[in-house]
Amino acid sequence: MTCYVNKIRTYKNFPIKGINYLDLNGIYLDNSSRDHLVEDCIQKIHPFLESFDYFGLIEARGFLVGSILADRLNKGIVQLRNKLGRLPDETKKVDHELEYGKAQLEVQTGSGSVL
């Protein structure tokens, strides 16, 4: 884990005062760091592989690493959008809390068992 932690930059008081934004771009730019992050995630997820069919990827940060995980673990992807109204067909909305407020995620119905 330590090989990529030093690639994370922290921006204090962003996007609002009292919140520290963790910028993962340093990990994304370095292939070795990105690979170590993905391998660490796989180790943590491995005991649960049989309990879900899809990775639920929250835009936009979740799309990057989640796509790699889904590919390596032979799982599908379900998009969880935080900008409502961007998915066609029937959807469900789920309330959730952020560090600085409340929000909703939207997912298409019939998406199966999602982690």
Q: Across the structure, where does each feature detected by a protein language model lie?
A:
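Active-site-facing substrate-recognition patch
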Residues: M1-S51, Q108
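Generic non-transmembrane alpha-helix signal with a bias for helix starts/N-cap capping motifs
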Residues: K7, G62-F63
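Short glycine/proline-enriched coil/turn segments at helix->beta-strand junctions
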Residues: E50, L73-K75
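Short glycine-rich phosphate-binding loop at a beta-alpha junction
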Residues: E50-E59
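Short glycine-rich anion-binding loops that position phosphate/pyrophosphate groups of nucleotides
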Residues: A60-G62, K83
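Short Gly/Thr/Asp-enriched flexible loops that form oxyanion-binding sites at enzyme active sites
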Residues: L64-L73
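Short, glycine/charge-rich flexible loops or terminal/linker lids adjacent to PRPP-binding catalytic cores
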Residues: K75-L115
